[in-house]
Design a protein with these regions (language model features):
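N-terminal small-residue-enriched
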Residues: 3-11, 17-492
Length: 492
């Protein structure tokens, strides 16, 4: 799976038109208030015929604004909404969904699922514990993009374009500002009823520099749960720094190749935590014997000063949730605790099979997709050293910055991380700027090579999207601090 540092979820397109008409952007909570009774009635009807039944309903609204030097595009988030019912037949799980909340359609969906459950048969109790959590959670943005309106958000994006364009040598700027408000409703026959309304806001600015026919770009990227206040440092200084970074990359040299000492910045350490290590801790991989980490639970995999966490409660984190899609309240789960791999991420079924406890890690991409064990916000916890102390330890190496993507291998334990830029480190000093590169190798070898973790405070989470296979994309966050280690690097 690739963790994309791309804009969240909405494909931008358009023709630069002006005079935008008002859109129907009712919050999904309004949609569900009209139909929750019908969903619960249908669930009650279904529950009379199976050992366990649950319903998951989902809907979202939002907008993506994209501006460049030639056009302005406004793209509404896909108005996808619907409900899926899932039952334990006594032998297996079965589910059926509907994109309509009309009573007739819900009844037809339930009857179809009821017939399937009857054919499947079985007398066993459902695996794991059925949750009884009840609650309503709502994101209350301090600076809602709704209040600005479409024209106000366009003005923000144009401001960012202007800040970057003012830097000499910048020939193109892509600026995107987008938000989405999503409601999820989970209820089951054991009594759980969880409704969560979550707003996520995100912005990215990509200035492109051109010299002698060669183009380069750096970027600025920020987002989180909340309104525009969750887009930290969305200001002229940050955008101008990205534009200057694009220009500087035109003069950057090729990165080193081969095994060397590396320092990972916070964005790259976060990519490592999620992509290279985190996917191997998703316990559905354990059940299928497809994770190299399965036999290592309880063992030391890294130095005593290394801890890796998945945290669905991180304040304002891009992957933060209130509860998962089986009704488990969000939690903070330690994966590596002081160098020891202490456990995996679980849904109710994997927890039952592996004699563990669920970790609020069951997430659906939407009502049309299956539930899977997924991450939320995954990061390397702060350590003991300053960044300067880590750099001073390096005689000849490279600092990797601006993580862009990664590829994981949960079965074989191999990894590859790509970064946009870096700097050489020579005799304990950061020196020459180098172009994009990739870090690769075996995850366990990299973990054992870690010699230092910086203590800089973890104040923000980088936004990204992660798929399970080639689809099922969900918002996930990554973060961390600086790591000092050994790895193989080369041009990307």
């Amino acid at each position: 799976m690739t963790l994309g540092r791309r804009a969240p979820g909405f494909a931008s397109s358009g023709s630069g038109r002006r005079g935008y008409l008002p859109r129907d952007l009712r919050p999904p909570v309004t949609i569900f208030e009209e139909h929750e009774g019908e969903i619960e009635r249908a669930l009650g009807k279904l529950s009379k015929h199976v050992p366990f039944a649950e319903a998951f309903a989902e809907g979202a609204v939002g907008e993506a604004i994209r501006v460049d030097t030639r056009s302005t595009a406004v793209t509404p988030a896909p108005r996808l909404s619907g409900v899926v019912f899932r039952v334990w037949t006594g032998r297996l799980w079965a589910e059926a969904g509907s994109s309509s909340f009309a009573a007739k359609e819900l009844d037809a969906t339930v009857e179809r699922l009821q017939a399937e459950a009857s054919r499947a048969g079985g007398t066993a109790a459902p695996p794991g514990e059925s949750m009884t959590t009840q609650g309503t959670w709502v994101t209350h943005p301090k600076r809602s993009p709704r209040d600005l309106g479409t024209e106000g958000v366009i003005a923000l994006a144009k401001d960012a374009r202007g800040w970057a364009s003012a830097v000499p040598g910048i020939v193109e700027v892509q600026a995107r500002v987008q938000w989405e408000e999503e409601q999820r409703l989970y209820c089951n026959s054991a009594g759980a009823r969880c409704r969560q309304t979550t707003m996520r806001s995100h912005a990215v600015v990509i200035p492109i520099a051109l010299e002698n026919g060669r183009a380069e770009f750096d970027y600025w990227n920020s987002g989180g749960v909340g309104g525009l206040e969750a887009v930290a440092d969305f200001d002229e200084e940050s955008v101008r720094e990205a534009a200057l970074g694009s220009k500087a990359l035109l003069q950057a040299t090729a990165p080193p190749a081969g095994e060397t000492t590396v320092v990972l910045d916070a964005s790259v350490a976060g990519l490592f935590a999620h992509e290279s290590f985190g996917h191997g801790t998703e316990a559905d991989q354990f059940v299928r014997d497809r994770s190299y980490l399965k036999p290592l639970v309880g063992q030391t995999v890294g130095p005593e000063f290394l801890s890796i966490v998945d945290d669905g409660t991180f304040p304002g984190g891009w992957g933060t949730i209130f509860c998962d899609d089986e009704g488990h309240p969000a939690q903070k789960t330690a994966l590596v605790d002081h160098g020891r791999f202490i456990g995996a991420l679980h849904d109710r079924e994997t927890a039952s099979v592996l004699h563990a406890r669920p970790t609020a890690s069951t997430r659906r991409s939407n009502f049309q997709c299956r539930p899977f064990v997924r991450m939320t916000n995954t990061y390397v916890a702060p350590g003991k050293h300053t960044v300067e102390e880590l750099i001073a330890e390096v005689n000849d190496g490279v600092l990797l910055e601006r993580g862009t993507s990664g590829i994981e291998d949960p079965l074989g334990g191999q990894m590859q991380l790509k970064v946009k830029r870096g700097h050489l480190i020579q005799h304990g000093k950061v020196t020459e700027l180098v172009r994009s590169m990739a870090l690769s190798g075996k995850v366990l070898d990299f973990l054992r090579s870690i010699r230092g973790v910086s203590r800089d405070p973890l104040t923000s989470i980088q936004p990204g999207f992660c798929g399970k296979g080639h689809s099922d994309y969900i918002p996930v966050g990554t973060g961390g601090v600086h790591l000092l280690a050994r790895a193989i690097v080369g041009p990307a």
